[in-house]
Amino acid sequence: VASIHSGFGRFLILNWPHTDSEHLMVSSEQMQNIEKEMFSMGMPVEALMEKVGIGISSWILDRHGLIENGAIVLVGPGHNGGDGLVVARELYMAGVDISIWCPFPLKKQLTQKHFDYAMQIGIENLERKPDSNSDLLWIEALFGLGQSRIISDEILRLLNSKKTFSPDKLISID
């Protein structure tokens, strides 16, 4: 891993052209290495979570057709779920009809804090799994880079059903 400096700060570079970072694609292993390097330099998890969530919500808001009928964030137990909760908060604050669904107990304190705040500001927490036949945008924040557990058949069926019904209304974040 190498780094460069610019007027906007220090950037980590692996083996890609930094001149086209908007279209950058990295593997899970590369992203884990980037995050590891960032954290070793002192980047707080909280700051990265905010940066990621705000960036994703901005991307979604720029594509209004995705959210014209509203959105649901599927929240996982770890920091990926926290990223999703930041996205939910930002979309809610922008006036999007948003709800969340948490099929697993939350395991990370930071994710729990974002969940608690989402509840305080009035974001709806669905008690039951969402309808995969709806025209709502699904933002999947269930599984992160460190995913090691087997994904349940129920979750797989639900995501596959949404993908089949409206593939343009399902995005995964991490």
Task: Annotate the PLM regions.
Residues 11-66:
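Positively charged, low-complexity intrinsically disordered leader regions
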Residues 2-7:
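Extreme N-terminal basic, low-complexity initiation segments
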Residues 9-14, 22-25, 65-74, 79-173:
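Glycine-rich phosphate/dinucleotide-binding loop and adjoining beta-alpha-beta core of small-molecule
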